[in-house]
From Swiss-Prot:
Keywords: 2Fe-2S, Cell inner membrane, Cell membrane, FAD, Flavoprotein, Ion transport, Iron, Iron-sulfur, Membrane, Metal-binding, NAD, Sodium, Sodium transport, Translocase, Transmembrane, Transmembrane helix, Transport, Ubiquinone. This is Na(+)-translocating NADH-quinone reductase subunit F. One of its GO terms (biological process) is sodium ion transport. Residues 130-269 form the FAD-binding FR-type domain. Residues 272-389 are annotated as: Catalytic. Its main location: membrane. The keyword Transmembrane applies. It comes from Pseudomonas aeruginosa (strain ATCC 15692 / DSM 22644 / CIP 104116 / JCM 14847 / LMG 12228 / 1C / PRS 101 / PAO1). Composed of six subunits; NqrA, NqrB, NqrC, NqrD, NqrE and NqrF. It is found in: Cell inner membrane.
């Protein structure tokens, strides 16, 4: 009798386990996609892909690269596309990035959209011109205390077909980087010592992707050049240092860097209007690209001025290049303003924050600032101050173009 009860108990237990397994398998079949699905793109291109991933990564695996400065985290909202069919309902993580009208039209963040069934999507046509390269670090010196000029050499015979003001994405692998190993030139080490920057360590467990504007212009072939500022934690905080910028600061000539691009929307308008460029910090990069493109490649006759703000002369770079451009082009003037000139600078030029300098020394007496086009890139506080000043002068928002790298 006891043996029968044991046998019965074992049988019932086995039946329960098999039943649970069956339920799990049925649920998995319902909830987890498997097999292949088809993605129709713009009604012209078709991909057959495995189901189960996110749309952004699935497209990238098939050499269709949407911009994603946050690397698929759902925060930058650059990987937008229109999902005509498939993809399921919009997720809560996407809702804040779209208006109700856009949501009805099918706009989605591709990094949040699951690939579970056949889909039809629309993406910008320029996406099909985006490529991927493994580049080699040519040089990576400091050009300011906390800014590196990273120059990457493309593979032989390759070029980036981009417009001035465009950007690419850099990919950095998992790493452990110690700031004490950085190669910082002697003239910039004082502030690194003062703020004890050497104590930081960057530890990254997953691949990180970030977007950076290019400092070169289209006729500077074979390379891509960037101005990248180290993203150190605010004083007194326990926040980790910037993942990508820490890795970039540790790069040495000969190191390999994966690059995707080009992308962009911070492009010059094709008009004859006066162009006023305003920059600060690492916002120099797209300013240089635009100004060199206008004067060196396009031979533009438009009236162009550039207003750049730096803390001291040590933080100003490319000054000789702009001096040369100004000497060669009567339609171009550039102005450097220092907010905190040091005694050794012996500075007799413009001083103050760049939005005040621009207003007091130019726009205050300009006959029609509302007819100018303003292109800017710099720290968020600078951008906000300049935009307020311009709108107070009656400049329409469509004539204020911003490369908002600072969030």
């Amino acid at each position: 009798m006891i043996g029968f009860e044991i046998f019965l108990a074992i049988g019932m237990f086995t039946a329960i386990v098999l039943g649970l397994v069956a339920i799990i398998l049925v649920a998995r079949a319902k909830l987890v996609s498997s097999g292949d699905v088809t993605i129709q793109i713009n009604g012209e291109h078709s991909l057959t892909v495995p189901a189960g991933g996110k749309l952004l990564q699935t497209l990238a695996a098939n050499n269709v690269f949407l911009s994603s400065a946050c690397g698929g985290g759902g925060t930058c909202a650059q990987c937008k596309c229109v999902v005509v069919e498939g993809g399921g309902e919009m997720l809560p993580t996407e809702e804040s990035h779209f208006t109700r009208r856009q949501a009805k039209e099918g706009w989605r963040l591709s990094c949040q959209t699951p690939v579970k069934q056949d889909m039809q999507i629309r993406v910008p046509e320029e996406v099909f011109g985006v490529k991927k390269w493994e580049c080699t670090v040519e040089s990576n010196p400091n050009v300011a205390t906390f800014i590196k000029e990273l120059t990457l050499r493309l593979p032989d015979g390759e070029s980036v077909d981009f417009r001035a003001g465009g950007y690419v994405q850099l990919e950095c692998p998992p790493h452990v980087v110690e700031y004490k190993d950085f190669d910082i030139q002697p003239e910039y080490r004082g502030d690194w010592d003062k703020f004890n920057m050497w104590r930081y360590v960057s530890k990254v467990d997953e691949t990180v992707i970030r977007a950076y504007s290019m400092a070169n212009y289209p006729e500077e072939k074979g390379v891509v050049k960037f101005n990248i500022r180290i993203a150190s934690p605010p004083p007194g905080s326990d926040l980790p240092p910037g993942q990508m910028s820490s890795w970039v600061f540790n790069l040495k000539p000969g190191d390999k860097v994966t690059v995707y691009g080009p992308f962009g929307e911070f492009f010059a308008k094709d008009t004859e209007a006066e162009m006023v460029f305003i920059g600060g910090g690492a916002g120099m990069a797209p300013m240089r690209s635009h100004i060199f493109d206008q004067l060196r490649r396009l031979k533009s006759n438009r009236k162009i001025s550039f207003w750049y703000g730096a803390r001291s002369l040590r933080e100003a770079f490319y000054t000789e290049e702009y001096d040369q451009l100004q000497a060669e082009n009567p339609n171009f003037q550039w102005h450097l303003a220092l907010s905190d000139p040091q005694p050794e600078d012996n500075w007799t030029g413009l001083t103050g924050f760049i939005h005040n300098v621009l207003f007091e020394n130019y726009l205050k007496d300009h006959p029609a600032p509302e007819d100018c086009e303003f292109y800017m890139c710099g720290p968020p506080m600078m951008n906000a101050a300049v935009i307020k000043m311009l709108t107070d002068l009656g400049v329409e928002r469509e004539n204020i173009l911003l490369d908002d790298f600072g969030g």
